């Protein structure tokens, strides 16, 4: 596809305000048939998604020359679009081909975030319901260093994950993330790195930024995917890898009290992949053998 190699300079993208320039890492975005450098504008003040949140995305990773589960991420953004009544017009194979082309614009071993997106450009009369036929899309790839697995602290959040009948939890929709953000703000104000969020019934759902696992007495546990949180691709991959290696992994309802007495806790997510939890409330923890095994198995899978 010749369109993959077209590049257009964008005055607005190059004219990033000085105080923000350092915050924008190297970025390439495929939008409207061209690759654009920098933080290219994709929406305006009348764009439906800009003021009413009709947007979905997905996130894959490139690191050490690999892009694990890229195909699943490309498929999921289309599933999310359909679930939010957007029109998923880009085939999975096209997302993947565009990604391959975009990666050529970075160093071979660059640590990158790969973000395909769909959003509604316009709404119907009254404004609330968007017009599916106005769906637009882009693919944004940018440098984002893999966080060091040095450990983080967590605490229980007063904010909860929404139920499937109160928010579009079955899609990776941008409108879901401000709720997680306020949980993280609140936890960090109390001196913690991340927040443990529960569902409406009071069972642990996830962290503010990732899925969460714990180990106790030789068994690994993780909250059952009940529709209140994203059943992450990295989460699913780690469960499969651990089970294939002979580790018992149980998906069930878990109380916060169970995490407070766990032998070890770790998180999984696309941005960091696997990270150890080294403190829950005031109780210190060490990276444990199941975290270490899961991380090693995942890296082996990623490079296979």
Task: Give the label of every model feature segment.
Residues 2-93, 97-101, 119, 124, ...:
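Helix-start/capping segments and mature chain N-termini
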Residues 87, 105-115, 150:
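Short secondary-structure capping/junction motifs at helix and strand boundaries
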């Amino acid at each position: 596809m010749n369109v993959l190699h077209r590049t257009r300079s964008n005055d607005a993208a190059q004219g990033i305000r000085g105080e923000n320039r350092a915050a924008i890492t190297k970025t390439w975005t495929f939008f409207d048939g061209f690759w654009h450098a920098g933080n290219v504008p994709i929406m305006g003040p009348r764009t439906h998604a800009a003021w009413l949140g009709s947007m979905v995305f997905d996130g894959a990773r490139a690191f050490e020359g690999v892009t694990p589960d890229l195909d699943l991420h490309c498929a999921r953004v289309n599933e999310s679009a359909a679930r939010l009544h957007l029109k998923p017009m880009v085939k999975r194979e096209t997302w993947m081909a565009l990604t391959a082309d975009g990666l050529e614009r970075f160093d071979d071993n660059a640590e990158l975030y790969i973000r395909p997106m769909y959003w509604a450009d316009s709404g119907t009369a009254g404004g609330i319901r968007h017009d599916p036929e106005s769906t637009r899309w882009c693919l944004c790839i940018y440098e984002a260093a893999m966080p060091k697995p040095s450990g983080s602290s967590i605490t229980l959040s007063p904010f909860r994950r929404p139920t499937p009948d109160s928010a579009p939890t079955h899609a990776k929709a941008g409108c879901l993330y401000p709720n997680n953000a306020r949980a993280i703000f609140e936890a960090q104000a109390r001196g913690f790195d991340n927040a443990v969020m529960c569902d409406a019934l009071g069972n642990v759902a996830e962290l503010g930024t990732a899925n969460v696992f714990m180990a106790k007495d030789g068994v690994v546990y993780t909250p059952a995917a009940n529709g209140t949180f994203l059943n992450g691709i990295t989460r699913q991959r780690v469960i499969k890898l651990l089970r294939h290696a002979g580790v018992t992994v149980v998906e069930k309802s878990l109380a916060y009290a169970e995490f407070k007495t766990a032998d070890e806790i770790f998180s999984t997510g696309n941005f960091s992949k696997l990270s150890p939890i080294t403190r829950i409330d005031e109780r210190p923890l060490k990276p444990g053998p199941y975290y270490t095994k899961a991380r090693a198995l995942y890296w082996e899978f990623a490079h296979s």
